[in-house]
Every structure is written in structure tokens, then in C-alpha cells.
Amino acid sequence: MLAVAALLVIPAIVVDPKVSAAAPRQMEALTRGVVAVKVSGGVFVSWRLLGGEAANTGFNVYRNGTKVNSSVITTSTNLLDASGSSSSTYYVRAVVNGVERPASNTVSVWANNYKDIPLDKPAGGTTPSGESYTYSANDASVADLDGDGEYEIVLKWDPSNSKDNSQSGYTGNVIFDAYKMNGQKLWRINMGKNIRAGAHYSQFLVYDFDGDGKGEVVIKTADGTVDGIGQVIGSSTADYRNSSGYVLSGPEYLTVFSGQTGAALATTNYVPARGTVSSWGDSYGNRVDRFLAGVAYLDGVRPSIVMSRGYYTRTVIAAFDFRNGSLTSRWTFDTNTSGNSAYAGQGNHSLSVADVDNDGKDEIIFGAMTVDDNGQKLYNTNMGHGDAMHVSDLNPNRAGFEVFKVNEDTSKPYGAQVHDAATGQILWGVYTGTDTGRGMAADIDPRYPGAEVWAGSGVGLRTITGQLISSTPPSSQNFGIWWDGDLLRELLDHVWSGSAGVGVGKIEKWNYNTGAVSRLLTATGTYSNNSTKGTPSLQADLIGDWREEVLWRTEDSTKLRLYTTTDVTAYRLYTLMHDAVYRLAVAWQNVAYNQPPHTSYFLGDGMSTPPAPSMYTTLPQASFTEVGTANALLAEQAALEEAAAAPEQEPAPQTGLETDPQPEPETTPAPEQLPDNSVPTGPVDPSAAAQAAPGAAMRALLGQAAPIL
């Protein structure tokens, strides 16, 4: 074991932060997401605070139609109902300025802290070489695919003979399914024989790209791909596989599929094109097929598609828009372009997306380099390729985002480093002299401000400013998850069995006093994904309050198991899925070497009150009550405040809001023109909210305990 390596701190460069020009962003319209779980002391109930709601929105909780709470709940979005039972049903009503809003969907009580989602497991097959294979559930992503305000799941099925790019051999076809949370299958897409199976081949994006309120699915396709309604893309008979199982010839496409039906909506040639295989770093098919993908708000308002090829040598990143049924190119960044050659070989096995320069538009953090929203180079740290990276406001005591990255190249001065996400300035680093394969960033120790970072290879556990806490870091360097009742992040990993070749999901808590972990959850009956990497199918804030859920496959892959926390928390935050950075991180989580999502603000011990999401939703044909509610809140709040400021006028009428599921408030266009069917749901004026309920936001974060009733 290497000794803890020396810390190198680089003198700071003072950069004046820009004033953000952020416009409201198109985001998903979600329901309240109520979940109720039977626990030993009654029933745990939690729900969402939506991004379009005022910070002082209150809530009433109803069991079997009778209100549970004695006073409006304003400091949390969860409670323990001591009188609840397994046969109870629950719904939640928002309370705005003393007026109770329409009810959420009514939910039944889960018997356990998980819910099984049935799957339609595909039958296995046989390759041209005679090898048999079976399927297991693999990576997943979510979006509201049908416009009902609830998340649906898009799941990748991985054949048992899937390959790393460095491995030769045929593979079974990659298959994608879409499911509702009750297990209803919406469609199946078969990628066909000309798409190889493996972690680096089929990166899939699930997001509402055209703003119709329903998510699309974007994947690289080829001749023989069959969409969700049985239509074949390109030739149904072409077979471009060579004798080693690689696909190094034939057309490549980029296809947008309907999230609701799986039908191919638009297909274009894939950019970046394959070209000459050897121009990507080898001639046998390894480096040419290293793909990444992400979603980015390149105009600051609407989401764009980002696809890439290559990161060991040549790198090409291409951005597309899907609008009005058409795919159009936005820009292409190529390290072969004059002036970009220094950016070659700087990519990671994953990417991140955030507005790092605070101009309201997203950048692509592509490992050691970052590309600006306009497709031009922003900076390059020259630290080269790496396997793990974390981007967030990791240090709340300095302006902007930080990047914690581990590096593979043993010739580089740092095996792990933290750099300024806006400028690329390396703030500090640790020399390791070896491939530092994994690294994590999360707030796991409240004794030090900001996140802690850790890695192997002698890096140790360190503060975000580089101070060594312990030469023995947590052994888990996988995922972090907000799970229990405090603001620290827990560790999500797996119990790996080398003999069985599988891992069982687990969540643990780091004890910063003893330097050990305690087990919070063993997901018995589940398996992790992607071999020793031990990643879940998905980790995200899918239901309930702001804390995260996790999806693991069951041992036989006939179900996905959705776990949720049942710990009462006194902290109240907007749903993480309405945070700009977090939602995009969920979209790219499945890409190559999966990484955990982070927020746009520091979420941890000692945090400040985070800003309310600046967002709007598109609701052409909303079919659920709460969409109207969520989008009426801002208009109602503004009307009441205007009336209060002008007492000689009659107060704004409130009739109809209780019974009308889709009120039509006045709309205000964003600084850049919004779609005609857009409805803004940005935050209320903070000063107005404070006058309405002094100290409500800070109390909600740091003050009173959640009710136990």
C-alpha cells in the first residue's frame, strides 16, 4: 500500500464571479409523489415540494379522508402517522395563504420500504459462434413518458455476453423497455445485431426534448434496430459484424423515439461519424466506439442532446436539438479542428453538465476539459483521462462549482485533484504515481465545511480544501445517497461475491468519529449491476420528499425493486428533480461508468437555504389534478400580494381553484421566448415570501422537527 501522498496546493487566482443571467428552464410537471410505508411506529408518509411552489407552501395530510395533522405542516414534507395502519390510504393537500388546494393522488400503504416493479424479461439466444446467452436488467433512467406527472422507467436489458470494447466476441442484442411504476410495459426497442452490447456502446437519454410534456428516448441506432411499434430502421437484413464480433462498418444513426409508444420519431446520421477506425487510437475497434451522452440547456431555456465519440485520443462532441419533430445540428466540437488539438485525450468514462461559468447556459465537463455552451473550448487542465468525476458546489465557502477528478495517467502530477469548474484552475492535488481508479465526493463529516473527497492510491480522506482527515478513507468509492434524516450523504455500494460474480446492494453510514461504517440497508434479494463497479439500475429522487430512492434488479431480473427511506427528517427541500444540475445528472447517470448525481448547490451539514428552482413547465394536455395546482400557485401568490399592496382594490377572486384541476393563470415569458404552450412556474419574490411568512425558509431547512402524529 502506498503511503499517503504529498498534497500540492496551488495559489488561488481571484476571479470575479459573473452575475447569473439564468432564465427559467423547461422542467417536468410532476405530481405530489406521495408515498406511504408501514413502519414499526405507524405509517411513514412523505411527498414533494415542487419547484413551482412558494417556499412557505403548507400541507395537510389525510388518512382515509380525515386530516391527520392538527396544524398546517410548513417545516417538512414528511411525517410519521402513529395511528396509520397497513389498510390506510393517504393523500396530501397543499395550503397556500390559508387556502387548501386540490388533493394529490390517493396512495395505499407499502408493506415494506420497497416496491417490486414486474418486468417482462426477454428470452435469451445464441450467437453465430454458438454461444448461448441470457438477459439481466441493467441501467435505467426515468422521465414522464406519457404526460401524467409520474415517472416511467426506461430499462436497458444486458445480455450475459456483453463486452468491454477491449474484448472480442459476439454479443446478444441490446434491448430497451419502458415501464410504468406498476409494471405495465409500454414498449420494447430491439437495437439489432449491428449494435454491440457493453457499457460503452448504448448510451441512452430519457428527457422531454421537444417540450410537449412527454419524455423522448435518444439512442445511437443502426440498420436492423426495431422500434417500439415494430418498424425497422434501415435494412432489416444487413449484418456488419466481423469475425471478432466488432461492428466497424455500416451506417450509424441517431434516433429519437417516442417515450410513450417507442416509435421512431426522427433519425439522422450519427455525429461524430466513425470514419477511419485507426484515427481514434487503435485499429481493432476499442477506442473508436467509446461513446458518451448527456442533456444540456445550451440556450439556457430548453434541453439539447449531446452525443460524443472518443476520449483516449481524438474526441468529437456533437449537440442536437429535437424541436417540432425534427433533429437539427447545433454544433460540433472536434479535437482535430485547428486550435483544439491540445484537448485530445482528456475525456473520462463519463461526463457532467452544469452552468459552470454562471452565464445561464450549460457547459459540458468532459473529464479534464470543458466545452462551452456554444461548442467552443472553455479550458483544459491537461490531466488526461480518468474513471471518476464529481461536479457540484463542493466548497460552499468559495464561489462557483468545483470538480473532483481522479486520473489514470501515471505521468501526471496529480492522481486526484480539485479544480475550479469555471476556469480549470487546479486548486490542489495529490500525486500518486499510479492509476487512481476510483474516487468519491460527498459531505460525510460535519466537522469540516463542504464535501469530503477520497480515493485509493494513497489519496486518503480529505476536506474539500485538501486537508488530510485520515489516511484510511471509506472503502466505498462508488455512489453517495441522501437517505437518512440528516444532511450528510450516505454510501451506496454492494456486497461483492467474487465466487458468484455478483453483488448485493447496500447503504451504509460513515462514522466520522470511529472511521468505520454502519449498515443501514442490505437489499437482500437484489443484485447490483456492472460487475465489480456495483452500481444500481438507478439512484434518484423519484418519489416522496427530497431524499433519494434506489432501483436494484432482483436476483432473477423479473423485477426492479424500488427502495425508499422511512426515516423522518426535519429538513425540507424542493424535490431534487427540479434542480437543474441534479436532473441532468440523473439523465447521464447511465452513461459508461455510472456516477452519482449531485445538486447545483451545496447540500450537506451547515448548508445555506438553497435558491428555489427557476423553471417553467409545458402542459398541452395535462391529465392530472396537481399540474393545474402547481402552476396556479405562483399566479395565486402574486395576485394575493398585489391585492394586499393595494387595499383599495378587491382581493383577487379565489373561487374555482378548489375544484378546477387546470386553472389558467397569467403567463410571463422568459427572457428568451418560450414555447406558446409554456406555463412559468418560477419562484416567488424571496422578499415577498419572507413578508408572508418571516423566517419560513430557514425554519424549513434548519429549525423544527417533522411532526410525529
Residue ranges and their predicted role:
Residues 19-22, 629-709:
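Composition-driven, intrinsically disordered low-complexity tracts enriched in small residues
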Residues 58-61:
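Short beta-strand elements bearing conserved aromatic residues within extracellular beta-rich modules
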Residues 9-19:
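C-terminal segment of classical bacterial N-terminal signal peptides
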Residues 1-7:
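Sec-dependent N-terminal signal peptides
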Residues 24-33, 42, 49-54, 74-76, ...:
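Beta-propeller-forming repeat regions
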Residues 63-67:
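Short amphipathic beta-strand segments in non-cytosolic proteins
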